[in-house]
Amino acid sequence: MEKSKRLFMKSKRSFRRRLPPIQSGDRIDYKNMGLISRFISEQGKILSRRVNRLTLKQQRLITIAIKQARILSSLPFLNNEKQFEKSESTARTTTLRKKKYRN
């Protein structure tokens, strides 16, 4: 091989394919909270299909199951993990405004 052709040939890296997030025996159902909670973000949002690595049909079923669980109040609509602490109230200097009288 010529040197110029060798520069363009890259070695192929082997990659390990990740396991699918939903196994064949898993039932996508609103009662299966362990499965559903894997597809929700920390904020309580439904994660996208690319992030989940799901098929279109699986994503649709997951979305429906999450919405059913929210309606039946098994899942919260918003997941506020952050507890807002009461910050020390900043001392406001309130000055009384004097009314200006126009003659």
UniProtKB/Swiss-Prot annotation:
The keyword Ribosomal protein applies. GO terms for cellular component: chloroplast; mitochondrial small ribosomal subunit. It is found in: Plastid, Chloroplast. Residues 83-103 are annotated as: Disordered. Gene3D superfamilies: Ribosomal protein S18. InterPro entries: Ribosomal_bS18, Ribosomal_bS18_CS, Ribosomal_bS18_sf. It holds the Pfam family Ribosomal_S18. Keywords: Chloroplast, Plastid, Ribonucleoprotein, Ribosomal protein, RNA-binding, rRNA-binding. GO terms for biological process: translation. One of its GO terms (molecular function) is small ribosomal subunit rRNA binding. Belongs to the bacterial ribosomal protein bS18 family. Part of the 30S ribosomal subunit. This is Small ribosomal subunit protein bS18c. It comes from Glycine max (Soybean).
